[in-house]
């Protein structure tokens, strides 16, 4: 959760999506690498150097040129997918908690359409902190909803905030919703 606008009866949280610096860096690397592999493959087929570095026209088209072409196609498909996710800002949205209407509204950008979840305060059982450390650490806040097995995550994907900040946000939200806070040991 990037920014919080808090008043006495309302909390608004903005969630960042896929427009992160790491996605721009990976997208740029995939673009350069994918085009480079395709140009090397075409150079080995035509016998003309299309790249300023190296001598790809000296490569045999079978098997090196074909393999480099396949790598280039795969890289460009991944590249297209990643840039599309960045373009639509996949996963961005907002959380809105309103005490006056006793409702929660969660909005996210999906792949093909937007996702909206509306809940009443009565449906929320507790606020859960899902914290795991190790090789793939995870620190997220989720709502435990009555009648649902899995908690509904409300923090952004891929966010790794300091533990104290996650605990404070979870405690503030649990106090605002007047429910228990789970997950602290």
UniProtKB/Swiss-Prot annotation:
Ranges annotated as spanning the membrane = 24-44, 58-78
* Record keywords: Membrane, Photosynthesis, Thylakoid, Transmembrane, Transmembrane helix
The UniProt entry lists membrane topology as: Multi-pass membrane protein
Say yes or no: keyword Transmembrane helix present: yes
Localization, per the record, is:
Cellular thylakoid membrane
This protein's major location comes to membrane
BP GO terms, sorted: photosynthesis
Its cellular-component GO annotations read:
photosystem I; plasma membrane-derived thylakoid membrane
* A Pfam family: Ycf4
**Residues of the signal sequence?**
none
Q: Does the keyword Transmembrane apply?
A: yes
InterPro entries per record? PSI_Ycf4_assembly
Q: What does this protein do?
A: Seems to be required for the assembly of the photosystem I complex.
Give the protein family: Belongs to the Ycf4 family.
Put simply, this protein is called: Photosystem I assembly protein Ycf4
Q: Which gene encodes it?
A: ycf4
């Amino acid at each position: 959760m990037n920014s919080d606008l808090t008043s006495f009866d309302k909390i608004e949280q903005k969630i960042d999506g896929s427009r992160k610096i790491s996605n721009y860096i990976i997208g740029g690397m995939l673009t350069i690498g994918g085009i480079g592999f395709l140009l090397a493959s075409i150079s080995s087929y035509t016998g003309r150097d299309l790249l300023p570095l190296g001598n790809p026209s000296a490569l045999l088209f079978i098997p090196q040129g074909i393999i480099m072409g396949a790598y280039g196609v795969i890289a460009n498909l991944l590249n297209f997918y990643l840039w599309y996710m960045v373009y639509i800002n996949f996963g961005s949205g907002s959380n809105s908690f309103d005490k006056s209407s006793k409702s929660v509204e969660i909005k996210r950008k999906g792949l093909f359409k937007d996702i909206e979840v509306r809940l009443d305060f009565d449906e929320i059982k507790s606020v859960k902190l899902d914290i795991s450390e190790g090789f793939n650490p995870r620190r997220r806040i989720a709502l435990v909803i009555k009648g649902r097995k899995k908690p509904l995550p409300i923090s952004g994907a891929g966010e790794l905030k300091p533990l104290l900040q996650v605990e404070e946000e979870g405690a503030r939200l649990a106090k605002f919703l007047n429910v228990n806070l789970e997950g602290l040991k």
